[in-house]
Amino acid sequence: MIMVSVIRSALTLSLALVLTACSQDTAKPIDLAIHNVTLIDAVNPIRTNRTVLIDQGRIIAIINSDAAHDITAAQQVDGSGQYLIPGLWDFHVHFTFDARFTDSMAGLFLYHGVTNVRDTGGLLEDLLPVVDTLRSAGAKAPSIWYSGPLLDGADVVYDGVNFPGLGIANPTPEAARANIAEIHAAGASFLKIYEMVTPDVFAAIVDEARTRNLPIDGHVPLSMRARDVAPQVQSLEHLRNY
């Protein structure tokens, strides 16, 4: 009987602690509540008069605004007459293509609902400072993934003379592997192959990328066919050069 009494006391204490913790969690304010907003997404019908609860960067609940009483949030936003959509992606961006627009691009993306971007070609010395700015604490900017420079052949199309400087030369397989090592060390998320690459350099890039677990985007090199290139890459950025 003594053992049963002890167990009952322990269970009672445990339950009391759980209830206390739940009460404290319920009272804890969330980060953001957006009220009276119209939701549009790719799966559901248009939903009006909704309250969206967000905490630690995640949506934790979507409820009817008529039932959203006593919501405790650090920030409350009235979305009456406004629309809320999932963040959009721009999968093909060149932040450093024209320096006149570089500084304004992040704000324009967010204004139009783009919250994630992939920069598909830029010299590291130009692009990395932009990435640092976009990722700095408090920056109002989309999340960015980048390839670094266009991996071109012995001749570079975007050479900074005839066109903006976005690409680098890869005259040999050895040069390509060395360039990829530098690009990978600079934090690139994927690689971008360009049009003047020869088949032997292309093969070296694919091999090195697989070794480093780096996805490949690319144009179809002028010396190759799309049917030969497509199985080796994760994305063909332009449907040409067949």
Sequence positions of predicted segments:
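Bacterial N-terminal signal peptides that target proteins for export
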Residues: 1-11
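C-terminal motif of bacterial Sec signal peptides marking the signal peptidase cleavage site
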Residues: 19-21
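Bacterial signal peptide processing site
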Residues: 23-25
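Histidine-rich, glycine-flanked metal-binding segment
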Residues: 28-30, 43-85
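Solvent-exposed loop/turn tips at the surfaces of repeat/solenoid architectures
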Residues: 36-37, 57, 209
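Short solvent-exposed capping/turn motifs at the termini of beta-strands
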Residues: 39-41
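Divalent-metal coordination cores built from histidine and acidic residues
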Residues: 79, 83-84, 88, 105-242
